[in-house]
């Protein structure tokens, strides 16, 4: 029974280093894959580069993790060597050394548990760092996309303004043409009116001077009426012969407002005019 127990312990001790080596190899491959992915991320264009401080902190954390992994590997190698030497000693030693080997196997199991826990922690930290890097990259991409959309909107607005300027110029030209056409039509209408209503001739006719004076005098009389004597004197004046004005109608020669003679005015013209104090005057 003791021999069976010893053989089982030896087989377990020999099998454990191989599992640790496999775990170490798998951790190395994962680290290489993560490093390759990080390199691909770093190879992206310059406008997607992260802030220097943030990148430096990430690199420091990575270096610490790699140092911890190296320490774990060294401890695993040393433990494997120790186990190999112990197995060689167990083969050469007698049954008295079985108790000592069992005592040595117990602390080696605790060390392996600690190593496994450290590896799990390192993997968790690496995954967290990768997530942070991806999140920062997504934020930068979103900001760049927003800037590109704003620039595109500004360019579209500028193009719309440039396209609108010719239309405004056309509208101004059309308005100017309409105003010119309106002015031309007004000038044409004025010329037609001048043709249908010609101006009075500006030639001087001396025979027509007296009717014009009579018309002006009648307008003044409407404002300031004359006395009876003045009316009589004005009515006695002889009119020129109408034979001289045969080429023109009669309404051009006589005023529109005719002044009729009253009998009192005619009688007053034949009375002698004397001053009121004629009795006191001395006759020479």
From Swiss-Prot:
Keywords: Milk protein, Phosphoprotein, Repeat, Secreted, Signal. One of its GO terms (biological process) is response to estradiol. It holds the Pfam family Casein. Mammary gland specific. Secreted in milk. Residues 21-44, 78-111 are annotated as: Disordered. GO terms for cellular component: extracellular region; extracellular space. The modification Phosphoserine is found at residues 79, 93-99. It is found in: Secreted. Residues 138-197 are annotated as: 10 X 6 AA tandem repeats. Sequence repeats lie at residues 138-143, 144-149, 150-155, 156-161, 162-167, 168-173, 174-179, 180-185, 186-191, 192-197. Belongs to the alpha-casein family. Important role in the capacity of milk to transport calcium phosphate. This is Alpha-S1-casein. The lineage of its organism: Eukaryota, Metazoa, Chordata, Craniata, Vertebrata.
């Amino acid at each position: 029974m003791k021999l069976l127990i010893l053989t089982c312990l030896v087989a377990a001790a020999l099998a454990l280093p191989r599992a640790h080596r496999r775990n170490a190899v798998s951790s190395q491959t994962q680290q290489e894959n993560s490093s390759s992915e990080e390199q691909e991320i770093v190879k992206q264009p310059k406008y997607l580069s992260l802030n220097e401080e943030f990148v430096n902190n990430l690199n420091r954390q990575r270096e610490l993790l790699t140092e911890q992994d190296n320490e774990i590997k060294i401890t695993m190698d040393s433990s494997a060597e120790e186990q190999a030497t112990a197995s060689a000693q167990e083969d050469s030693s007698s049954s008295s050394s079985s108790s000592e080997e069992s005592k040595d196997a117990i602390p080696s199991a605790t060390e392996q548990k600690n190593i496994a826990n450290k590896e799990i922690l390192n993997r968790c930290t690496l995954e967290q760092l990768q997530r942070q890097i991806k999140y920062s990259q997504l934020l930068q991409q979103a900001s760049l996309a927003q800037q590109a959309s704003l620039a595109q909107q500004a360019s579209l607005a500028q193009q719309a303004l440039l396209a609108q300027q010719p239309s405004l110029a056309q509208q101004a030209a059309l308005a100017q043409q309409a105003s010119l056409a309106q002015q031309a039509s007004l000038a044409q209408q004025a010329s037609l009116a001048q043709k249908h209503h010609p101006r009075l001739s500006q030639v001087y006719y001396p025979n027509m001077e007296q009717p014009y004076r009579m018309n002006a005098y009648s307008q003044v009389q409407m404002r300031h009426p004359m006395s009876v004597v003045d009316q009589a004197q004005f009515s006695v004046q002889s009119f020129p012969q109408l034979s001289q004005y045969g080429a023109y109608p009669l309404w051009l020669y006589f005023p529109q407002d005719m002044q009729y003679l009253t009998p009192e005015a005619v009688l007053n013209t034949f009375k002698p005019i004397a001053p009121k104090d004629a009795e006191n005057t001395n006759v020479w």
